[in-house]
Regions:
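Terminal transmembrane helical anchor/hairpin motif
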Residues: 39-64, 173, 180-253, 625, ...
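Juxtamembrane extramembrane loops of integral membrane proteins
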Residues: 280-414, 420, 426-435, 439-443, ...
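Extracellular ligand-binding/catalytic regions of CAZymes and related secreted enzymes
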Residues: 254-282, 288-307, 314, 439-455, ...
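Selective transmembrane-helix segments that form parts of the transport pathway or gating/packing helices
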Residues: 19, 77, 81, 108-137, ...
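Acidic, S/T/G-rich, low-cysteine, solvent-exposed domains in lumenal/extracellular/periplasmic regions
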Residues: 476-714
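Hydrophobic alpha-helical transmembrane segments of multi-pass membrane transport/permease proteins
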Residues: 19-45, 72-81, 187-190
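Long, hydrophobic alpha-helical segments
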Residues: 65-91, 126
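Hydrophobic alpha-helical transmembrane segments of polytopic membrane proteins
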Residues: 150-176, 239-241
Length: 766
């Protein structure tokens, strides 16, 4: 080891008596300075325009996206190392000094380890350049997430060391430094793209994925340290250092060709085995370095997986080859992406097993029938399979897939079926940018197989809003639209309809919804609803202006009334009957997501809403959930013509000003259980058209989901909201930005340049 350390010291002397080492340090410092100051400048501008509060500021500046400091520089680091490593051994070969090393009492491994340790020190100096920006971040960002950034630096350091080992081996192959550098770039490219090769072959796919360098350092930069990634870099370093030792040793000794060949094979096989075995789910250790544990599933999800015990969860993915919108996301080439998506869950439950079924069947897509041109489905499959170089025999026919499972109710879309202890449920994909189910939907699907499902019944018989229609005023989007992520059926609920004309309302449902009936409730219906209320059933009642007389008789038994008239709101942009209501502190108790919406001063849109009045005569504790803006809103009596002249307040016509509640929560104890009722003066806030509103940023989704979650006593949706970050403020000014630019663009690079120049001049004089 002493000899290796001495070689390392001599190699460092050689490195720093060359302008390349100094130049690379200066270039890296300037490059980092430009990225850092540009990001800080944008943050300073945002601070002046929108206020001083941000979210996850450390991540945004250092690791959050491709424009952040560490990822942006990571893409260019491969250019640095070959310029240093190209001369490590090539210089010895070309100058003849390798013969002196051979004749000295030094072992080959000491030569290789010494050279590599010199590179480890130089890489540490490169990391030290990053340290200057960490110091700046600590000064300018209160609650700076230091551990997150250190995790990123650790990943970059491992990557630099792996690059150095590769460059050292390439330098052992030739006496020409330029050839060594080019060869190093070739190996870098191979390791970057090997993970995309032969992805349709099962074992080869796993092997190439475990050998691929792509994404390894990025995971560490994101704050997730895994033994899989650390072992990968260790295996790469072991591989190329081992190959370097064997190469030099083979030129030093005379042995049959199969001896060094066997050594090469052993080192390669050992390295591949290390990379493959350490990437298997049961052998991976994790450490989440982020302050909010953003790389780890929430505690609620962890607890849910723990409750499943030792029984396995079977996940079967059904992919329709003819559904071109989704199949490319679930093809065999994407299998490793699927494994990575489920890795956070497998981390806490290793016996989640995955199965993949590929089939073809018709889908409700006009482009499919346009593509057929009279062909059969089988002929179309053969044509597409030939074009994509796939075996058509891997796809089950419609008859074969229907013997296993009938996916026509799912429109033969890509879907996953979860099985656990004899129960099963579907886990769907969605028509949004995220596409795949998030932690919330996965948690809901798993919990659906473990408990009795909360059921929401929608009253019918009085022309109420429909839960199954897609018309503007109806509720399919919120309740039963399978391709919509936030639909109740995808959040863990069951939804159904019920007619109180012919049957009693079950008392074991989560809630009954009475959504804007257009006809008066009959005495029998009122009696059955009252019986349900008296038994402690939860209830959602939604009314509309102009129909107060329909619901007020029922509401009177609750101590609530819908006031006559319509609330209007002055606005330069919207119709006067579109009221943008504020959330209240009472909403914070419904869900964490709604609490965050309240803290963010979010609004809920209610087009056509009336005010609610209440008293305590029925024994309920009443809290407003939504209130209209007292400055711009008033209650207009009489008919409202929204598309006529500008609506104005008229006390003479009976118009009222004041604080108007548009949604109320009512609670009381019945038979030892808290009864929960919500009354709203508008039924459109849950409608298909309102949930699709694009001209105002509203919290209708969050508000509606929170209400039904409240009815289920927190069973669904699963709460996966994460805590807010503490590093949300920037202690920075325009003058400070100028100082930082001066330091990182001028002072620091200038000091390095002067120091390196003086050292090189003194060395030349000697």
């Amino acid at each position: 080891m002493k000899k290796a350390l001495r070689i390392a010291r001599l190699e460092l002397n050689t490195l720093f008596y060359s302008p390349i080492a100094w130049l690379l340090l200066i270039v890296l410092l300037v490059q980092l300075g430009i990225v850092y100051t540009t990001t800080m400048s944008e943050m300073e501008q945002a601070k002046q325009l929108y206020g001083g509060s941000f979210g996850f500021l450390t991540g945004q500046i250092f690791s959050g996206n491709s424009l952040s400091l560490l990822p942006s520089v990571l893409e260019k680091l491969y250019l640095y190392i070959p310029l240093i490593t190209m001369g490590l051994m090539s210089r010895e070969f070309s100058s003849g000094t390798i013969k002196l090393l051979y004749s000295s009492p030094i072992k080959v491994r000491e030569i290789v380890f010494g050279k590599f340790m010199a590179m480890m020190v130089y890489c540490l100096l490169l990391i030290g350049v990053f340290g200057l920006f960490i110091i700046s971040g600590i000064i300018t960002i209160p609650h700076f997430d230091l551990v997150l950034v250190l995790s990123g630096l650790f990943g970059i350091y491992l990557l630099l060391c792996a690059y150095s080992a590769i460059g050292l081996f390439m330098s052992c192959l030739t006496s020409y430094q330029v050839v060594a550098a080019i060869s190093t770039f070739v190996i870098f490219a191979f390791l970057a793209y090997v993970g995309t090769l032969w992805q349709d072959v099962s074992f080869v796919r796993d092997l190439t994925h475990s050998f691929s360098m792509t994404g390894r350092a990025e995971t560490l930069i994101g704050g997730l340290v895994t033994t899989k990634d650390v072992a990968y870099f260790a295996a790469i370093i072991f591989l190329f250092l081992g190959l370097s030792i064997i190469k030099i040793q083979s030129t030093r000794e005379s042995k049959p060709f199969y001896v060094p060949l066997a050594r090469y094979v052993f080192v390669v096989v050992a390295s591949v085995a290390i990379g493959y075995l350490t990437s298997r789910p049961g052998f991976i250790g994790y450490y989440d370095a982020s302050a909010t544990k953003s790389n780890t599933i929430t505690e609620n999800m962890q607890h849910l997986l723990k409750e499943t015990g030792d029984d396995p969860i079977e996940v079967t993915e059904y992919a329709n080859f003819l559904d071109s919108r989704t199949f490319y996301r679930a093809s065999p080439e994407e299998r490793n992406e699927d494994v990575d998506r489920w890795a956070p869950y497998v981390r806490f439950k290793s016996n989640i097993h995955f199965h993949y079924v590929y089939y073809y069947d018709s889908i409700p897509d006009p482009y499919l029938y346009k593509a057929i041109h009279g062909m059969s489905l089988r002929a179309l499959v053969d044509k597409r399979a030939a074009a994509q170089k796939m075996d058509p025999r891997m796809f089950l026919t419609p008859a074969q897939i229907r013997k296993q499972i009938d996916l026509r109710p799912e429109q033969n879309r890509l879907v996953m079926k979860l099985d656990y202890k004899g129960k099963s449920t579907f886990l769907r994909v969605f028509d949004d940018n995220e596409f795949w189910p998030s932690e919330t939907e996965i948690a809901a699907a798993i919990k659906r197989m473990m408990i009795k499902l909360p059921k929401i019944d929608f009253l019918t018989g009085g022309y109420e809003r429909s839960m199954s229609k897609i018309a503007d005023r109806d509720y399919q989007t919120l309740t039963s639209r399978k391709t919509f992520r936030y639909a109740l059926i995808n959040q863990g609920f069951d939804v159904d309809t019920i007619s109180a004309e012919t049957q009693d309302i079950p008392t074991d449902i989560a809630a009954l919804v009475i959504a804007d009936p257009k006809t008066d409730l009959s005495p029998d219906v009122l009696a059955r609803i009252q019986k349900y209320i008296n038994a402690g059933g939860n209830l959602l009642i939604e009314g509309e202006p102009g129909k107060q007389s329909v619901l007020n008789p029922l509401l009177k038994t609750l101590g609530v009334q819908m006031k006559e008239g319509t609330i209007v709101q002055q606005s330069d942009d919207y119709a006067p009957n579109l009221v943008l209501d504020y959330l209240t502190p009472a909403d914070s108790g419904l869900s964490i997501a709604l609490k965050n919406a309240y803290l963010d001063s979010a609004i809920v849109s209610t087009p056509g809403v009336t005010a609610l009045s209440w008293d305590s005569s029925a024994g309920f504790s009443v809290n407003p959930l939504l209130v209209a803006d007292t400055k711009t809103c008033w209650l207009k009596k009489g008919p409202l013509v929204a598309d006529s002249a500008e609506v104005e307040y008229s006390a003479a016509d009976g118009d009222e000003k004041g604080l108007f509640a548009t949604a109320l929560s009512l609670t009381r104890m019945v038979n030892g259980k808290q009864q929960r009722i919500v009354v709203t003066g508008d039924a459109d806030l849950m409608s298909n058209s309102e949930l699709g509103r694009r001209n105002a940023r509203t919290a209708n989704f969050v508000f509606n989901t929170a209400i039904f979650g409240w009815f289920s006593y927190g069973q669904f949706p699963i709460e996966t909201t994460r805590p807010r970050s503490k590093d949300n403020r920037l202690r920075f000014s325009e003058a400070g930005l100028k100082a930082v630019k001066f330091i990182f663009w001028g002072l620091a690079p200038g000091c390095l340049l002067v120091f390196g120049t003086v050292l090189l001049i003194r060395r030349k004089r000697k």
